[in-house]
Design a protein with these regions (language model features):
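Short helix-capping/linker segments at secondary-structure and domain boundaries
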Residues: 60-66, 202-205, 248
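Polybasic (Lys/Arg-rich)
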Residues: 235-262
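Mg2+/Mn2+-dependent nuclease catalytic core
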Residues: 141-142, 146-234
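Short cationic/low-complexity microdomains
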Residues: 29, 229-240
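Metal-dependent nuclease catalytic cores that hydrolyze phosphodiester bonds in DNA/RNA
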Residues: 1-158, 255-262
Length: 262
């Protein structure tokens, strides 16, 4: 009798589903998968923070205005003494840094996030470019941030897709290079994401709307090919097999290692 992965996941981690992120971890180090499922693996970077801002302005614009506090230099300067304001570089003074820390703390207490004026402006300028080229009203038109918890190949999968169109699914990505995004699909296993979404919603056409983060913010419409979907399916099955073995054998994850041929 085949082991019920959902039951084992619930028993070990207190949740019975997998996600794109957890499946991606399972393709690498099972110790990382174990940490991710326990909530111990936290990623934070300027790129991730900007991506969150960009997506919220794109798909949940009203919420973005509630969540973010745009930090301007003038707002910080207004809190400084005349002496600090008159210094050669006010931003290098302890008073300036203290005022900045206070503003961040105040935002945190209100459940808000501080964002620089430059990042806020850039995200909005990027979205303006999407509108100008027509992608915003076509391949980013539909229902936004659609959540799901469904069974796929006997496994419970959970996730959120960016945009559910009338006959397509699209996912927004900001990137350094729109042309080189094809390599990111492989390296970050975005193909697994595409496979899960298309299967769960029964929609064949999946697109990435990619946009460069440097001016003039070149956008690209990248269609997911059948070959890429097939690769995503193979990765999905491989990850599930690794997770099944890990849960069945109940081994110490740090004893895990990769084995492959090139």
């Amino acid at each position: 009798m085949k082991m019920n992965i959902s039951d084992k996941l619930q028993e070990r981690y207190g949740k019975s589903h997998l996600s794109y992120s957890s499946l991606k971890q399972a393709l690498g180090d099972m110790a990382q998968f174990d940490r991710y499922m326990k909530g111990e693996l936290k990623y934070q970077s300027d790129a991730l923070d900007f991506g969150t801002l960009y997506d919220m302005l794109l798909f949940e614009r009203e919420q973005a205005f509630e969540k973010y506090v745009v930090l301007s230099d003038s707002a910080i300067m207004s809190r400084l003494s005349d002496k600090a304001k008159a210094s050669k570089k006010p931003s290098m003074t302890l008073e300036y840094k203290s005022a900045l820390a206070s503003m961040k703390e105040e935002a945190l207490e209100e459940g808000k996030t501080i964002v620089s004026h430059d990042d806020w402006q850039m995200a909005n300028d990027m979205i303006d470019r999407l509108a100008t080229c027509g992608l915003l009203d076509t391949y980013l038109a539909g229902d936004y941030q659609v959540g799901f918890l469904e069974e796929l190949n006997g496994i419970q999968v959970k996730g959120f897709l960016d945009c559910l169109g009338s006959n397509f699914i699209s996912d927004s990505k900001s990137a350094r290079s729109a042309e080189k995004f094809r390599y990111a699909v492989r390296d970050f296993s975005y193909d697994i994401q595409a496979y899960i979404y298309t299967k769960v919603f029964g929609i064949k056409d999946f697109y990435w709307v990619v946009q460069e983060k440097t001016y003039p913010y070149l956008p690209a419409l990248v269609k997911c090919s059948e070959q890429t979907l097939f690769t995503g399916e193979m990765k999905f099955n491989d990850a599930v097999s690794r997770i099944r073995k890990f849960l069945t054998d109940d081994y110490e994850p740090t004893t895990d290692y990769l084995e492959y041929e090139v």
